[in-house]
Amino acid sequence: MASSAFAFPSYIITKGGLSTDSCKSTSLSSSRSLVTDLPSPCLKPNNNSHSNRRAKVCASLAEKGEYYSNRPPTPLLDTINYPIHMKNLSVKELKQLSDELRSDVIFNVSKTGGHLGSSLGVVELTVALHYIFNTPQDKILWDVGHQSYPHKILTGRRGKMPTMRQTNGLSGFTKRGESEHDCFGTGHSSTTISAGLGMAVGRDLKGKNNNVVAVIGDGAMTAGQAYEAMNNAGYLDSDMIVILNDNKQVSLPTATLDGPSPPVGALSSALSRLQSNPALRELREVAKGMTKQIGGPMHQLAAKVDEYARGMISGTGSSLFEELGLYYIGPVDGHNIDDLVAILKEVKSTRTTGPVLIHVVTEKGRGYPYAERADDKYHGVVKFDPATGRQFKTTNKTQSYTTYFAEALVAEAEVDKDVVAIHAAMGGGTGLNLFQRRFPTRCFDVGIAEQHAVTFAAGLACEGLKPFCAIYSSFMQRAYDQVVHDVDLQKLPVRFAMDRAGLVGADGPTHCGAFDVTFMACLPNMIVMAPSDEADLFNMVATAVAIDDRPSCFRYPRGNGIGVALPPGNKGVPIEIGKGRILKEGERVALLGYGSAVQSCLGAAVMLEERGLNVTVADARFCKPLDRALIRSLAKSHEVLITVEEGSIGGFGSHVVQFLALDGLLDGKLKWRPMVLPDRYIDHGAPADQLAEAGLMPSHIAATALNLIGAPREALF
């Protein structure tokens, strides 16, 4: 090869970013030389192209009346029931389809609530994917799944969109049982590259030739599993496509995203088209093959050819992905149908070996000005007025348990400088954005990285700080080994605040906090508690602050408090460890509730009192350690003891019966019954519908009590 034989335009490849002079060329040194023919057009980037294009899209939507309450006209979308109906459309028609699809998403979500911003950001990408690929033969995986609404509309579910996230309606995420076009169920983040790689390897082992596409982004690239999967994908070298949906919620240190040049527009289009050039890709494949088949000096030369090809093809920001073994293309304008179709078609048709990553830059909330200006507030929405963007939030006399937790933690931090808070990209969801505003240097957002969050908290505890790790109950599952090995085994005083405990309504089984009591209370050193109301939540935050010799956790539900008086100054009072309380004295039947289930027990007591049965209601407060004296007293003074919890088998009730059995309290006439969530997943729906399906309504508790004492119960239902 000749040294310095070819000069590349600097807008294609420069060290550290894109050149501001698009016509200036830069020569490769002798150590980075490769002879080939490449076009070198002199393109002038338009710094306003992105904003101009966005304005046109917004204007077209407004002109069609899509911001009003009535369903907007969608003549082209009305002809599309499944992806097969898109195949004969022109690119111009695909643009019209995208506009109409975006309008339909806005209209439908305004009526049901749901994840709006993420879905609006991938409209063009969704259209292009279904235009080029053929699901369900080809597999398209949507990471997290909250951006899947356009996908659902195009795959036969448009007529069911008014049922989104409602009882017996469509799931808010992809779900295998809902459609053959949903090849993998999601809800938690950063899983699709792993699953997609498994599908690709399975395809290869079975001799098939379908495509596998994993769409990931919207924060999911902050989780370690995504990089573990890419590392394995690069090693296995199986054909698959990873689409990085970069909507600025992804930790990607790409200079062009923050530099003076816009990351989208004519410049990136030319770069992306060049990078998908089959000749260059085949060059890399030849080099890759040489490195695997030859040794000695020729092996070293072939390795350099591969390295140079990667460098010239990839462009700025690709180093990480290329080092992991993924062929990088991008960045690509995720709202430019022409480019998306061209690149996806090229990638699909080019015979290659190994995984490809296409870096697509999108805008969250695209095409709806209210969502564009406040993508945080329009990530997940309740019902809203499309014309004004105003969300119809229910006016409640009480605040959410999430807010009460945050206020309690702020109150503790005001008087204790060692209190710190950690969350995994969920400042709003956990309430810690309130803590962040008050104590910006004592609140840590670690990204969607629950494993790191737990061990990071363990390290903070080692230094004498008092870390509160606020993670949804269902997301705590992702970091269980860290809870066991890094925290509990070492008796480090990390405090786990587990929001969304129990049934969670519209978010369904992926977010249901069913298992935390079971997997936390089995740990030898963990203190496990749950408040029955918002006042006790304040007290348990104070209790957790005071526990400095071992880890602790407390769970609390989604939804609002019941309206009890709060502690003065929002400052809770520590509870004696392992001490429950009697809320109502009665006879014959004792209802022992744990956490939010205590309120259902009180409701059942009212029903039973109307039928002449005065029962005892107790609030356990602690699952570990149990209030053994309280349980022993209830068991000895009542005919029936019913434990009630909004959790799975193996939780609070199991700990109670273990004690009852070992203490000999089951050897007499006592009748004990546990009431727990059924041993199956409960689908999304209204909270009351979910409780009814679970058999944990006050009427179910009352009926169980009546049945155990031999009284009729039919009138309860």
From Swiss-Prot:
Keyword Magnesium: yes
One GO-annotated biological process of the protein: chlorophyll biosynthetic process
InterPro entries reported for this sequence: Dxylulose-5-P_synthase (IPR005477), THDP-binding (IPR029061), Transketo_C/PFOR_II (IPR009014), Transketolase-like_Pyr-bd (IPR005475), Transketolase_BS (IPR020826), Transketolase_C (IPR033248), Transketolase_CS (IPR049557)
CDD domains, A to Z: TPP_DXS, TPP_PYR_DXS_TK_like
A Gene Ontology cellular-component term: chloroplast
List of residues binding thiamine diphosphate: H146, G187, H188, S189, G219, A220, N247, Y368, E450
Loss of function: phenotype: Albino phenotype and seedling lethal when homozygous. The phenotype is caused by an early arrest in chloroplast differentiation.
Cofactor(s) in the UniProt record: Mg(2+); thiamine diphosphate
EC annotation from Swiss-Prot or TrEMBL: 2.2.1.7
Catalytic activity: D-glyceraldehyde 3-phosphate + pyruvate + H(+) = 1-deoxy-D-xylulose 5-phosphate + CO2
Transit peptide region: 1-58
Pfam family membership, one: Transketolase_C
Enzyme class: transferase
Reported induction: Circadian-regulated with a peak in the late period of dark phase and early period of the light phase.
Subcellular location per the Swiss-Prot or TrEMBL entry: Plastid, Chloroplast stroma
Cofactor: binding details: Binds 1 Mg(2+) ion per subunit. Binds 1 thiamine pyrophosphate per subunit.
Tissue spec. comment: Widely expressed.
GO MF term set: 1-deoxy-D-xylulose-5-phosphate synthase activity; identical protein binding; metal ion binding
Something else known: Plants over-expressing CLA1 show increased levels of plastid isoprenoids derived from the methylerythritol 4-phosphate (MEP) pathway, such as chlorophylls, tocopherols, carotenoids, abscisic acid, and gibberellin. Mutant plants treated with exogenous mevalonic acid partially recover chlorophyll accumulation and plastid development.
The family this protein is said to belong to: Belongs to the transketolase family. DXPS subfamily.
Assembly information from the UniProt record: Homodimer.
Protein name: 1-deoxy-D-xylulose-5-phosphate synthase, chloroplastic
Primary gene name: DXS
